[in-house]
């Protein structure tokens, strides 16, 4: 669940910048404007460039630390692609044990083929490495989704309702004891889904974030995550879907969601962005 949640949470809140048409006749300008409108706005966000990275810290029942880095960003008239590295540590606070360390590498493709079309995002054959106290997991994951993955260029007036989004995901992992190259079990979830409900825009206000005092606005929605049929070591395990109420605090000047609040079963977890930077030395 943590893998799918991490992947799904991050793209929202990116602010795109309009691509200006080049010189030439009216027809050329119109064509350039049409291409710019059709491109996924996320690709033109000021932070969407090679070497950019974001650091997030979460509290609550599952404390976590997440660092995401973009590499090898390439743009096209209808979108972009990039390598996304996700390094995370997470743990159940009640267990008081060492964290689970997870490393993911995704080749992400973002497209919008027409101005009226939904933005799509896809990653195939992502490499997953995870390590816990007694075991490690290695394998592949994939996800595909359509909908609103960023808040750029949208009508964010108070009271506005934005459309949601749908993700389908799959993961196939082998489980190894630490220090051994012989797999002792497997885990497969081929029909996992994440449904994001309609988003409701709140009032722009000042917010004390871990990056300082910022102007931000709350955007709230319900999120339902289902692993679908889960196979562990050849045994079918049914996992109940989880439903969460989420509030993104989107800060336009930073073009990013600097805080996310997740409420589930009367418990609230907060995930804060602590750094949003570009490494000019990165490829």
Where do the language-model regions lie?
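Surface-exposed acidic loop/strand-edge motifs in secreted or periplasmic proteins
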Residues: 126-179, 186-189
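Bacterial N-terminal signal peptides
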Residues: 1-8
């Amino acid at each position: 669940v943590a893998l799918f949640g991490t992947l799904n949470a991050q793209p929202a809140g990116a602010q795109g910048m309009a691509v200006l048409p080049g010189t030439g006749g009216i027809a050329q300008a119109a064509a350039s404007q049409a291409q710019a409108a059709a491109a996924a706005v996320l690709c033109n966000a000021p932070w969407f460039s090679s070497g950019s990275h974001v650091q997030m810290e979460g509290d609550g029942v599952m404390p976590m630390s997440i660092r995401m880095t973009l590499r090898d960003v390439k743009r096209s008239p209808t979108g972009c692609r990039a390598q996304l590295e996700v390094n995370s540590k997470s743990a159940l606070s009640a267990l008081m044990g060492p964290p689970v360390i997870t490393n993911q590498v995704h080749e992400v493709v973002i497209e919008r083929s027409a101005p009226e079309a939904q933005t799509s995002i896809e990653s195939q054959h992502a490499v997953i490495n995870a390590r816990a106290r007694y075991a490690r997991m290695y394998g592949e994951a994939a996800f595909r989704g359509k909908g609103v993955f960023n808040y750029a260029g949208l009508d964010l007036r108070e009271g506005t309702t934005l459309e949601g989004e749908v993700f389908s995901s799959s993961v196939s992992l082998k489980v190894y004891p630490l220090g051994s190259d012989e797999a002792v079990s497997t885990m497969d979830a081929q029909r996992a889904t994440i449904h994001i409900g309609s988003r409701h825009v709140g009032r722009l206000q000042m917010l004390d974030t871990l990056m300082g005092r910022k102007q931000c606005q709350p955007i709230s929605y319900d999120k339902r995550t289902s692993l679908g049929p889960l196979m562990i070591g050849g045994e079918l395990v049914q996992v109940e879907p989880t439903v969460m109420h989420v509030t993104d605090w989107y800060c336009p000047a930073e073009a990013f969601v600097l805080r996310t609040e997740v409420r589930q079963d009367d418990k609230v977890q907060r995930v804060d962005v602590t750094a949003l930077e570009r490494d000019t030395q990165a490829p």
